[in-house]
A protein has these predicted regions:
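Short, low-complexity Ser/Thr-rich regulatory SLiMs
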Residues: 21, 40-43
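Negatively charged, low-complexity tracts enriched in Asp/Glu with abundant Ser/Thr
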Residues: 1-27
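Acidic, low-complexity intrinsically disordered segments
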Residues: 43-91
Length: 91
């Protein structure tokens, strides 16, 4: 699979994320040029889960740094956001 973009609702806003499929079976979630995290289907292939940060191979990209003073939404990969991302990946 190739890199693609998705849009998800985040609060009252909509956020565009870049999704980078990995050979290891997970999808890196890129936001403003940094790795926000990664998602994958759990063992039963029914539910999406967040990949622990120490299991993500960063490669050439830095991890995203949260900055509350920046002029952008501070997206957090909570359970709801992970589910939305997974639904968009399979849409």
């Amino acid at each position: 699979m190739e890199v693609f973009n998705i849009k998800i609702g985040f609060g009252a806003n909509e956020v565009t994320l870049t999704i980078l499929p990995m050979d290891e079976g997970y999808y890196k979630v890129i936001y403003y040029g940094g790795i926000l995290g990664a998602v994958r289907l759990d063992n039963d292939h029914m539910t999406w889960e967040k990949v622990p940060d120490d299991e993500i191979e960063a490669g050439d990209l830095p991890f995203y740094r949260h900055d509350l003073s920046a002029d952008r939404l501070d997206v957090v990969l909570d359970e709801h956001t992970v589910h939305q991302i997974g639904e968009e990946i399979h849409a």
